[in-house]
Amino acid sequence: LSKIGTSFMRRFYYNVLPRQGHLFGAVAYVGGQAAGFISATHDSDGYMRRAFRDNLFRIAFVAGTSIPTPRRIEGYREAAGLLRGSTPVPAKGTDTAPKGEILSIGVRSSFRSFEFLSTTGIDVYKDLIEGAMDGFREANLEEARIIVDSDDIENQGVYRRLGWRPRQSAVPGWFTPSTEFIWNPR
């Protein structure tokens, strides 16, 4: 979704969706400086459909006031593909358990460097992921996932060390070659 642009992400994704309960997240600070962030959901299959349904006019406004660029158009196409390819939201009263998902994570390069890690012992990236994993565990979810670019070997290694395992190497609806990792909180 980041391809849609920073305006969409700032004005809608990171602002409206957490207040409505579709997303949760955290910002990590080190020495008073923002070092990184994470966003996640307790409902991987349904959050996007529910957010779209709850915010149709707001999404149309934000999209309509953003300058269309080839990258944004690709982002809109990818989001539409993800909506079409996602599992339908189960009817109330069914036994389908929601799955969590880490949606985005970012840590400033200065806080990911070997020098920073070796001098402080603080692994901001790992701490943010573990915080989301705690959120999934507290929500009593049976499974969580994260989609990682296939060529992002470094972060795939981090997820493996934290107990995540690859499930599929071609993720339906994603244009960027990606790998799905899953984790079972129980």
Report the location of each language-model feature.
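Conserved GNAT acetyl-CoA-binding A-motif
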Residues: 98-103, 134-149, 177
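Conserved acyl-donor/pantetheine-binding loop and adjacent beta-alpha core of acyl/acetyltransferases
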Residues: 46-106, 112-120
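Conserved beta-hairpin
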Residues: 22-42
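Conserved GNAT-fold acetyl-CoA-binding loop/helix
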Residues: 1-14, 52, 58-59
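Short loop/turn motifs at secondary-structure junctions and domain boundaries
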Residues: 16-21
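Conserved acetyl-CoA-binding loop-helix of GNAT-fold acetyltransferases
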Residues: 107, 113-136, 157, 161
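Short hydrophobic/aromatic beta-strand or adjacent loop that forms the aromatic wall/cage
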Residues: 23, 101, 175-182
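Conserved active-site alpha-helix within GNAT-family acetyltransferase domains
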Residues: 150-168, 173
